[in-house]
């Protein structure tokens, strides 16, 4: 097996492999770190490479922490019975991974989100690593594999649900029977697709 295959096998079931112990130690530090933190290199090199990361100028990797669980809605100030406050049992329409990508994009407005992947979770948080690209960097513009991201159509792509996590949340990875109401969008079908 090649190096990347060993890494992939270890990350398939982190608790059973050496990755579990590593994650325990790393998360102690991760909890103290800021919500969005730029890192030197990817934690999961195999996953990052398969999602388009290259170790060259113009690529940035960011680790993002997201609170687990349903959406925390703002509490009403006016009077009403507790059951009608609309506080609980409301889940967000976005996945936590998509939310993590948006957090990274807001922190680095000059970069575009390419992709992201899971790196860990505990009882309270989930961590994702987001691969970001500088669309104005000459190295990116001259690379035919990634130069497409510099086009106008991809500006703010994460906020329009054009990343893999966004498309998955919008139901666009489903095809055929049962997916009639997700294209061109859920809004176009009055929200019946979700």
From Swiss-Prot:
GO biological process terms on file: cytoplasmic translation
A Pfam match: Ribosomal_L15e
SUPFAM superfamilies, per database record: Ribosomal proteins S24e, L23 and L15e
Composition skew (Basic residues), residue ranges: 184-194
InterPro entries: Rbsml_eL15_core_dom_sf, Ribosomal_eL15, Ribosomal_eL15_arc, Ribosomal_eL15_CS, Ribosomal_uL23/eL15/eS24_sf
GO cellular component terms given for this protein: cytosolic large ribosomal subunit
A single MF term (Gene Ontology): RNA binding
Keywords: Ribonucleoprotein, Ribosomal protein
Region (Disordered): 168-194
Entry keyword annotation includes Ribosomal protein: yes
Signal peptide, first to last residue: none
Origin superkingdom: Archaea
Assigned protein family: Belongs to the eukaryotic ribosomal protein eL15 family.
Assembly and interaction partners: Part of the 50S ribosomal subunit.
Protein name: Large ribosomal subunit protein eL15
Species, as recorded: Thermococcus kodakarensis (strain ATCC BAA-918 / JCM 12380 / KOD1)
Encoding gene, per UniProt annotation: rpl15e
